[in-house]
UniProtKB/Swiss-Prot annotation:
GO terms for cellular component: extracellular space. Disruption phenotype: Knockout animals, generated by CRISP-Cas technology display no discernable left-right anomalies. It is found in: Secreted. The gene is ciroz. This is Ciliated left-right organizer protein containing ZP-N domains homolog.
Length: 480
């Protein structure tokens, strides 16, 4: 009886060993064995406003590379990451190595195969592993991040002749840990929030917003962008490995703008970014909304760092009474307040941007300027579809200026109640080419190397206004 009992357990053990051994080898030539899907450890994934990032140990990177090569239909190579990332960018993927030889896999929420389910962005990835028999085995992982509100995509900028003020929402939604944050001015001067006055920055922090201000002469640096002199604020709020942009640009100080109002908007992501990573980011303008009175004509120019918008002065300029600094004489001060919403191809959320700019008080009113009375605010939206074909050299300015001639190197864009049914040709100066048409938001996914199309699943997220304290509200312009 004892021998029969031992024989039973031996047979059970052999059966288990047989089952475990052969379950690892799928039947059928070239077939891949899939393990049950599992969520990746929260220690390995980080969620940002526009994208999620997966940390991949170097011992597992070959499995990810094999999977990417299969779905992209071209060989992804770790030895030529720049070339591979050019192809991966078509699906809004990015692969980068860290100092320890491990890798970061970045996926934008609007990338290929990203799905939205129950308030989360999800992407199923496969770590493919080749077995000794040549067959593939795959571990399935689920990258998952919550959809966030777009409150970080708001910026209010006020430029006065003597000082500048920038307001943005708190990047983490509260100010409880503000002691751990510090400012970086011009990439060199680093101080804590409490010591910001040492670099000429006044800080006002609420539960939802941070407002910085200071004298223009201490904070702003004169730079030249597309043959135009501007004053630039290069200020970042940093915390550990992350940074949050407070960059802004003001027009140079003068008594009047001339025939055109020119806005310089730094290209920047709306949420936290890895420190140092923002310098390699390239953002492409996709859509523009102008919150002004009817028939506002806009000329758009962009390069790698800035979006530049030209508006005729008489369409936005206002005036108010003032007293001159010298002599305290009564005069006239010109100003404008402009609301813009900018949408970039590489970002899941728009940027809501407001600029108030005040010129110096002038005793004499220039006759060339006739401010146009503003009426009730009406939004006019142009839907742009831009395709950029970068050349081998660094991408520089895309110049778009009004013209009726197809032989000239530009295209005119008019924001009005009714958009033109078509726009003319556009060629881009220097190192890139852009085609623009009023044809809606979404473009089909570009061809990959094989010439095939991928199914693109948009990570739509959601966009909502936020409740911000009245004292620091990022208000829109008040048009009289």
């Amino acid at each position: 009886m004892k021998n029969q009992h031992n024989t039973f357990w031996v047979l059970c053990l052999l059966f288990v060993m047989f089952d475990e051994t052969f379950s690892a080898f799928p039947f059928g030539n070239g077939r891949i064995q899939f393990d049950p899907i599992r969520e990746n450890s929260s220690d390995n994934i980080e969620c940002f406003l526009d994208y999620m990032e997966l940390w991949v140990p170097r011992k597992q990177i070959n499995g990810l590379v094999l999977w990417l090569s299969q779905i992209m239909r071209f060989p992804v190579s770790l030895s030529s990451l720049d070339r591979s990332n050019q192809q991966l960018s078509r699906c809004k993927y990015f692969l980068d190595a860290d100092a320890d030889g491990n890798f970061l896999f970045r996926v934008h929420y609007t990338g290929c195969y990203v799905q939205t389910q129950e308030g989360f962005y999800k992407l199923e990835i496969h770590m493919v592993k080749k077995t000794s028999s040549g067959r593939g085995q795959s571990n399935r992982y689920l990258m998952r991040c919550p959809a966030m509100t777009a409150q970080l995509g708001r910026e209010k900028l006020r430029c006065d002749p003597n000082y500048v003020q920038v307001s943005r929402p708190i990047p983490l939604g509260n100010s409880n840990d503000q002691a751990d944050w510090f400012f970086s001015l011009r990439g060199e001067l680093v101080v804590s929030i409490e010591d910001a006055s040492l670099i000429g920055v006044e800080v006002d922090v609420s539960n939802s917003s941070v407002t910085v201000s200071g004298l223009r002469g201490q904070l702003l640096d004169g730079i030249k962008i597309l043959d135009r002199q501007i004053d630039n604020l290069h200020l970042w709020l940093a915390h550990g490995f992350y940074a949050y942009s407070l960059e802004a640009s003001c027009p140079s100080v003068s008594q009047h703008p001339g025939e055109e109002v020119i806005l310089h908007i730094p290209k920047q992501r709306v949420g936290l970014v890895k420190r140092g990573s923002y310098s390699a980011d390239i953002l492409t303008l996709k859509n523009l909304i102008v919150g002004q009175s009817a028939n506002v004509t806009v000329t758009v120019t962009e390069n790698k760092q800035f979006v530049v918008i030209n508006i005729p002065s008489h369409e936005v300029l206002q005036r108010q009474d003032c007293y001159t600094t010298i002599g305290n004489n009564p005069g006239v001060q010109f100003f404008y307040c402009i609301d813009l919403v900018l949408e970039f191809t590489e970002m899941a959320y728009p940027i809501n941007w407001t600029l108030e700019n005040y010129y110096e008080c002038s005793v004499r009113v220039p006759q060339m300027i006739q401010p146009k009375p503003t009426t009730a605010e009406t939004f006019h939206k142009i839907k742009l579809e831009l395709h950029t074909t970068p050349r081998s050299e660094t991408r520089t300015a895309l110049v778009i200026t009004p013209t009726q001639d197809n032989t000239l190197a530009s295209t005119s864009v008019t924001l009005a109640a009714k958009l033109r049914e078509s726009v003319h040709s556009a060629i881009v100066q220097e190192s890139s080419k852009t085609e623009m048409s009023a044809s809606g938001y979404d473009a089909e996914l570009d061809h990959v190397a094989s010439g095939e199309y991928f199914n693109r699943i948009e990570g739509s997220g959601y966009y909502a206004e936020t409740n911000i304290s009245a004292a620091l509200r990022l208000r829109k312009c008040h048009h009289l």
